[in-house]
Each structure stands twice: as structure tokens, then as C-alpha cells.
């Protein structure tokens, strides 16, 4: 948001016009202008592109989605079809992850362990249907080696975690998840010390493992709940706050130089559409998306978010339109007048894959 998509579409339009002007395929022009050995590895604002995945991602989608074969088939179709015309495009994206306002790249969390072994987690991120609470719960469950049903992620509230940053900039899980993880690590250290001490092995606390609802040190093993109760009777604190701030960020707004992002996320999308040249009616026939999400915490959520983002972008560029009357009042103000895509507008064939996963 905030002008990013508008800038991106302008750059992509420039690439398309260059391709037409020189009689080349747009994909070939895009590939020649990716970051790399001949084009450089620094952005215009001076940030080094450290993990350049786009060349490999484009090559993979180009092959698996049969770009060149379909390009030939579409050209043949268009020669024979006077009214319905087809189009094909493959578009990459490199998206910086972090707030460009450095102070917003921080998050807090509060984690409580109860004597029945259940855990309550509160963090500063806002759940708006994107699956954030589920991922946060998974992070806590993974740290303690527990099932997700032992974790309760409570509604976000500033009397538990104050001074929360906006849940935006694609950083909600990064920031709040790390804050929760840090709180869990603190609690694990206390529990591990308690367990090792009970065995007379105080110097072995660093070797304690939390696995499958149990706590293990060599041949010694008890359930997580048993250790929690043991810690409670030993007067060990079972509550901790956590904090995280994104590292490596520095950006000079006066010079427009620096490192405003911790890292980049990459994606490649290929769309095949049909357009009725008499009416303007269109259908999205087939979509293939390959997206880099790193080590996915929840592939189902990530794929759903990618699908939703594609449909959202499709609506923005086709049916959605802000309209004002002569008095300056917005008149496309409801679902009847602001045309977001419906279920019938989704691609006939919609394939989303996470890069690096089988």
C-alpha cells in the first residue's frame, strides 16, 4: 500500500513497452534486467540484495508452467479468433520486509504458564483474518514442544502489551513472533534450570530438551506439566515478557540511502487471461504463482494469503473504482457500488506453490 503498487505497475509497464519497441518477449527483457553479476547487486537506495532468488524462481515457473509453449499456443489462438483474445504475462516481485520508519520495527509479548501446563500468550499484533494468532500459537508450542491446543493466544490489548506497532508492512509475524519466542526462551531457561537442579545437575541446564510434551535430560524424563508444577512449588516465576527489534536497519531519509529493510521476499506470478474485445468482459483462465516465504510456519495459511493477495490485486486493477460526485462525496461506498471480486471471478485454474517446497 501507500503508493507501492502504483510504483511497481509503472515499472512493469515500462518493461512491457520496451519489449514491444524492440520486438522482444517481455519475459526476456525482465530476465535481462534482474539483479545479478552484470547488472549489479545494489538497489537504487544502496541496499545490497543479499539473497537473490528471482532468477531461480523465474526459471522454475518458466519451466513448470510451460511459458514458451503456452505463448506459442496463445499466439496461434489469437490468429484464429477475431473477437476473443488471450494474453499471457509472467511478472516477478521483490518486496522489502520492514517498516521504513525504523522505530516501528519493535514488538512486545507477555507469556504466562499455568500449573496445569497450559500457556497464555499475548502479543502486539492484530488478528484480522490473516492467521497471525495461529502462527504465534505455533511458535510458542514449538518452543515448549507442546501441542497447539495447550496454547491460548488472547485478544490483543494494550494493557498487557503497550505501545504496539501497526500490524502492517508484512512484518506482523516477524516482529510479534520473535517477541513471543524470546519470552518463551526466558521461561524455558528457568524451567530447565529448575529441572537440572532437581536432578543435582545444575551445570547441565543448557542440555535440557523440551520434546513431545516432555522435558528430557539424558535418561531423565518428566512431563511438561509435572515440571511446571515442580517449578511452581520451587517458587520459580512462570511469567515473562518478551521484546524484539529488527536488526541491521539504518536509513537516511535526507539522502535516500541505507538499509530500510531486513530482507526481501520474492514472488513470481504467471497469468493467462481471455478478453472479449467487443464488450471488455474478461476471464482469468489460469494462474501459476511461485512465492518465497522462507521456512513456512504454516503453509496452508501462507498459500491462502497468497491466493487472497492475488485476487485483491486483480480487483484493484480491473473492477474496483473510487467514484466521487460533483460535491466531492464518495459514491462508490458500499458493496453494491464498489465492485470487489466475487467467488465467480477467481481463476478457473489457480496453482500456488511455496518456493523450495516439494
Q: Language-model segments: which ranges?
A:
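Conserved beta-alpha junction segments in alpha/beta enzyme cores
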Residues: 1, 89-118, 123, 127-130, ...
Amino acid at each position: 500500500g501507500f503508493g507501492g503498487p502504483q510504483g511497481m505497475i509503472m515499472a512493469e509497464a515500462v518493461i512491457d513497452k520496451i519489449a514491444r519497441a524492440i520486438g522482444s518477449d517481455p519475459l526476456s527483457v525482465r530476465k535481462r534486467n534482474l539483479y545479478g553479476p552484470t547488472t549489479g547487486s545494489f538497489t537504487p537506495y544502496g541496499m545490497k540484495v543479499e539473497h537473490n532468488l528471482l532468477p531461480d524462481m523465474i526459471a522454475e515457473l518458466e519451466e513448470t508452467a510451460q511459458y514458451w509453449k503456452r505463448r506459442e499456443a496463445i499466439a496461434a489462438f489469437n490468429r484464429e479468433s477475431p473477437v476473443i483474445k488471450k494474453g499471457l504475462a509472467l511478472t516477478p516481485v521483490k518486496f522489502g520486509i520492514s517498516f521504513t520508519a525504523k522505530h516501528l520495527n519493535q514488538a512486545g509479548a507477555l507469556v504466562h504458564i499455568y500449573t496445569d501446563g497450559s500457556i497464555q500468550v499475548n502479543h502486539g499484533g492484530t488478528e484480522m483474518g490473516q492467521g497471525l494468532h495461529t502462527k504465534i500459537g505455533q511458535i510458542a508450542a514449538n518452543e515448549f514442544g507442546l501441542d497447539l491446543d495447550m496454547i491460548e493466544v488472547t485478544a490483543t490489548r494494550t494493557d498487557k502489551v503497550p505501545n504496539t506497532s501497526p500490524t502492517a508492512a508484512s512484518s506482523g509475524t516477524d516482529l510479534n513472533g520473535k517477541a513471543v519466542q524470546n519470552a518463551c526462551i526466558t521461561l524455558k531457561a528457568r524451567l530447565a534450570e529448575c529441572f537440572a537442579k532437581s536432578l543435582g545437575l545444575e551445570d547441565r541446564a543448557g542440555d535440557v530438551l523440551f520434546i513431545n510434551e516432555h522435558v528430557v535430560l539424558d535418561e531423565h524424563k518428566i512431563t511438561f506439566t509435572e515440571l511446571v508444577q515442580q517449578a511452581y512449588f520451587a517458587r520459580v516465576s512462570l511469567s515473562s515478557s518478551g521484546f524484539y527489534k529488527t536488526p541491521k536497519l539504518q536509513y537516511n531519509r535526507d539522502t535516500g540511502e541505507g538499509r530500510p529493510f531486513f530482507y526481501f521476499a520474492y514472488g513470481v506470478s504467471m497469468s493467462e487471461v481471455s478478453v472479449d474485445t467487443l464488450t471488455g468482459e474478461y476471464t482469468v483462465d489460469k494462474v501459476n504463482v511461485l512465492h518465497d516465504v522462507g521456512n513456512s510456519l504454516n503453509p496452508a495459511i501462507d498459500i491462502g494469503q497468497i491466493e487472497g493477495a492475488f485476487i485483491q490485486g486483480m480487483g484493484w486493477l480491473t473492477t474496483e473504482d473510487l467514484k466521487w460526485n460533483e460535491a466531492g462525496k464518495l459514491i462508490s461506498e458500499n458493496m453494491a457500488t464498489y465492485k470487489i471480486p466475487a467467488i465467480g471471478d477467481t481463476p478457473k485454474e489457480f496453482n500456488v506453490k511455496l518456493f523450495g517446497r516439494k
